Amino acid sequence: MNKMNNTKSTHIDPAIKELFSCFFDGKPVSAELIDTSRGEDDFRNTLIITTDGGERSVLKIVSNDFTFPERILMWQRTVEDYRDLGYYCPRIFCDKSGGFPVIDYHGKRCIVYAEEFSIFKPLSDRAADGENDQAVSAKAYFKDIWSMSAQLAAKKLDHTEYPSGYCLFETFCPSDRIDEVMENALEWKKYALSLPVEFLEQVQRIWDAWSANREALKERYSRLPTSVFQADLNPTNLLIDESGAFRGVYDFNLCGRDVFLNYLMRENYADFEEEIELIRRALTIAKEHYAFSEAEKAAALPLYRCIKPLWYTRVYDLKQAGNDAAGIMHCLDRIEHYLTADIDFISYMD
């Protein structure tokens, strides 16, 4: 979920000044534009506005199928849930009338909401400034983010039916045909079926095992406890103070209801062995704040088998093997092993 940012200073158009006045007081004197759009169907512009008094505020101008008033209000409420636990998250604002303006902007019909300008830098900015190494630093905050997330899980928030961007067995937005896990698995199957014929029996065996596991998981998954999460813990969203301490998160546009175990497993990804250790570490941290139910313990291994063995990185590994028969066999054998192995997660949840 890394963002491709395009940042530049921009002249303040009179229309933007008028839009700003719908949310805030003060006279805008400068603006910084950050473009985090992802193609024609997901337009996102952030304007950081500075007033003549030196105050900074944020306008978000968005056109996609998952940003609409009801969802923004849900983000707004979830921000307050995080703040209630002592974590810093910039507040999200309606306009002065209590709504969210819809405007024509860059040839698109866009909704607009506002945010408090963050008093803390994201980890990615501190790394870019040469203060530390981003990848290493993200690992340094592992306990912080899973302590925080477990506390949110323990609240069992139920104020929304909108799923998070990590949702399983349902879709995040109308343009999604299937959930991301199934999308990745189908992409794996498509490529695996193009392998030389001598591998196709194993490919079919893997697919049958994966499909049977997913179908069995589906029935029990709907009964697992849920809460509401920010759902995007990459370094661009982790807020760090000047002393290097973790303070909170921002960017709630993937926020929503989710099963905590799904969220935890989806946020921890690497090669098989490292990935399992990351999940176990996160579970160990989480259980200090969250009591895993017997249903969650029983679902942990089937959930892992559903999410991880056919993740998009496994397609990449197969493609990297090219025409090397030994390399292909190695990839398939590892997938089949981790799809069927009796991996212990329960002892890390007790």
Language-model-detected regions and their locations in the chain:
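Active-site catalytic-loop/activation-segment of kinase and kinase-like phosphoryl-transfer enzymes
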Residues: 165-217
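Conserved NTP-binding catalytic cores of kinases and kinase-like/nucleotidyltransferase enzymes
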Residues: 1-97, 241-242, 350
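Surface-exposed helix-capping loop/turn segments at secondary-structure junctions
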Residues: 154-164, 217-222, 291-295
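ATP/Mg2+ or Mg2+-diphosphate-binding catalytic cores
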Residues: 311-350
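ATP-binding pocket architecture of kinase catalytic cores
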Residues: 55-160
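Secondary-structure edge/capping motif, primarily at the C-terminal ends of alpha-helices
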Residues: 156-160, 185, 189-195, 217, ...
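Active-site activation/catalytic loop segments of kinase-like enzymes and analogous catalytic loops
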Residues: 257-293, 305-325
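Active-site acidic catalytic loop and adjacent metal/ATP-binding pocket
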Residues: 42-51, 58, 211-261
